[in-house]
């Protein structure tokens, strides 16, 4: 949050949820869209048969080729160019089998150094291509198998091959580096340290001028360069932003998906990172992609927009000014639970803004859908909807709070007081207390806090009293303050709620697994 929001919240007489929690960044154990199958499975990719080639019977090929390994090794180590190409191609075909390719068996033959050597043979591009293809598939294996490729010096020569005059060799080098970078953050940073990014970006400067397959593979590799925790050095990967700003307009779904994922990784972090993403002029198109018919595109687009609105109010307003709210309203009704959850999280960071931004959420007719999810959705979504409503009560005007109450937010907030997650109990208490604060101001004019009766009708008073003995210190303090400040008349009616001699021990427990 920026300074003005902190000052506003500090000026309130009560102790509220810590001010820097109102707007919530994504953390390792945080709320996130579960990686979709494509993202998970394609951190590494194996090149398989050439399109149009005859399908190979897996079992017969493996058995045949494994029997021939000694002779193939002899041929690949010969000085005969024809035999070298023939045996390298045979190894490539063996490694291109779709299911359970014998990567380990090939590594054990000791041919990897020889394959790397072939990459340097500029006057033999067909051999370069076959060797690069074989090494790409070895690098698609386990971390140990990828390490064999790295330890034999392949990264350096693959980076050189990004500038090869031969299209197929360049594309295979792109693919290989994507597989190596996709192995781990260590491998990713190793590839980046070999200065692989500039020639890759050079390939993508004019996407319309190169083959679609190259654009797809290069964008996928670029996405792998940007992904992972710990994050890659931003001073290196920030150079990707102008290229990604072009790629999100490319008319190919695979390219869109990977370009959006790359932007989601780059926008995840400090306000300074967020500003650089905004300055790349991607917000309007990313908001437009929230309405893409394919969920695989919506997902990273929403992740990116969600990251941007974790920034300050001005950064959030950039997103609102390009009509994000109408798309977010639609996403609250997505058939995908993960999308609904992330949309709620995104809205919660918007309602952590100023009163004008809260009004924009109200005007977009989002509150009824939020309240519905708060009352009826799965608990993971309810938590995010609770943050969205609670943040709106913290930063909203009395009129805005009145509107929230009129939409039925009180009962589902009260119902959350019975859950086991202390963090969400405190979020719900925060919302309830903010509503009572607004009601107390109204009572100064009318003599009656209108919201106390609504909370009572929602069985909120009993739930609040039940929390007096909660072991979480923050919960106890909030409940004690609510009772003493707003519910004293009920306390007198019911007698001593805290008998003399009672003692409480508090644990400063927080739910480390809570999705922030």
Curated annotation (Swiss-Prot):
ARM repeats lie at residues 55-96, 100-140, 143-182, 185-227, 229-268, 271-310, 313-352, 355-394, 398-437. Residues 1-55 form the IBB domain. Belongs to the importin alpha family. Disulfide bonds: none annotated. The N-terminal hydrophilic region contains the importin beta binding domain (IBB domain), which is sufficient for binding importin beta and essential for nuclear protein import. Residues 1-29 have a biased composition (Basic and acidic residues). Functions in nuclear protein import via a substrate-importin alpha-beta transport complex that passes though the nuclear pore complexes (NPC). Binds specifically and directly to substrates containing either a simple or bipartite NLS motif. SMART domains: ARM. One of its GO terms (cellular component) is nuclear envelope. This is Importin subunit alpha-B.
């Amino acid at each position: 949050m920026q300074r003005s929001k902190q000052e506003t919240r500090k000026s309130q007489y009560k102790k509220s949820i810590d001010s820097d929690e109102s707007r919530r960044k994504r953390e390792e154990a945080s709320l996130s869209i579960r990686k979709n199958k494509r993202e998970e499975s394609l951190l590494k990719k194996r090149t398989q048969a050439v399109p149009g080639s005859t399908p190979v019977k897996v079992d017969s090929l493996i058995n045949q080729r494994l029997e021939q390994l000694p002779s193939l090794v002899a041929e690949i180590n010969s000085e005969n160019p024809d035999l070298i190409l023939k045996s390298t191609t045979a190894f490539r075909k063996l490694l291109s089998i779709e299911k359970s390719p014998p990567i380990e068996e090939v590594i054990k033959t000791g041919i990897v150094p020889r394959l790397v050597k072939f990459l340097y043979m500029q006057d033999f591009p067909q051999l370069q291509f076959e060797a690069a293809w074989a090494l790409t598939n070895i690098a698609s294996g386990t971390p140990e198998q990828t390490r064999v490729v790295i330890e034999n010096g392949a990264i350096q020569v693959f980076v050189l091959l990004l500038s090869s005059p031969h299209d197929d060799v360049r594309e295979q080098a792109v693919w290989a580096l994507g597989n190596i970078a996709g192995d781990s953050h260590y491998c990713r940073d190793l590839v980046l340290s070999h200065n692989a990014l500039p020639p890759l970006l050079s390939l993508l400067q004019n996407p319309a001028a190169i083959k679609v397959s190259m654009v797809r593979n290069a964008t996928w590799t670029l996405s792998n360069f940007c992904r992972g925790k710990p994050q890659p050095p931003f001073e290196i990967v920030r150079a990707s932003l102008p290229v990604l700003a072009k790629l999100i307009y490319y008319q190919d779904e695979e390219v869109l998906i990977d370009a959006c994922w790359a932007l989601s990784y780059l926008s995840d972090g400090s306000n300074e990172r967020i500003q650089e993403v905004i300055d790349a002029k991607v917000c309007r198109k990313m908001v437009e992609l929230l309405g893409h018919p394919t969920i695989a595109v919506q997902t990273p687009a929403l992740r990116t927009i969600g990251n941007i609105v974790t920034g300050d109010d001005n950064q959030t307003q950039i997103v609102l000014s390009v009509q994000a709210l109408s798309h977010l309203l639609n996403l609250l009704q997505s058939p995908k639970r993960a999308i609904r959850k992330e949309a709620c999280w995104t809205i919660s960071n918007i309602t952590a803004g100023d009163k004008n931004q809260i009004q924009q959420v109200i005007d977009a007719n989002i509150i009824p859908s939020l309240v519905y999810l708060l009352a009826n959705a799965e608990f993971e979504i309810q938590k995010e909807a609770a943050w969205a409503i609670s943040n709106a009560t913290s930063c909203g005007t009395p009129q805005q709070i009145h509107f929230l109450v009129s939409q039925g937010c009180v009962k589902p907030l009260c119902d959350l007081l019975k859950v086991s997650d202390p963090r969400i109990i405190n979020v719900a208490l925060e919302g309830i207390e903010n509503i009572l604060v607004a009601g107390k101001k109204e009572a100064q004019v009318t003599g009656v806090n209108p919201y106390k009766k609504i909370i009572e009708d929602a069985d909120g008073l009993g739930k609040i009293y039940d929390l007096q003995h909660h072991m979480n210190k923050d919960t106890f303090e909030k409940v004690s303050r609510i009772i003493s400040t707003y519910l004293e008349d009920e306390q007198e009616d019911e007698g001593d709620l805290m008998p003399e001699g009672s003692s409480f021990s508090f644990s400063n427990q927080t739910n480390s697994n809570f999705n922030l």
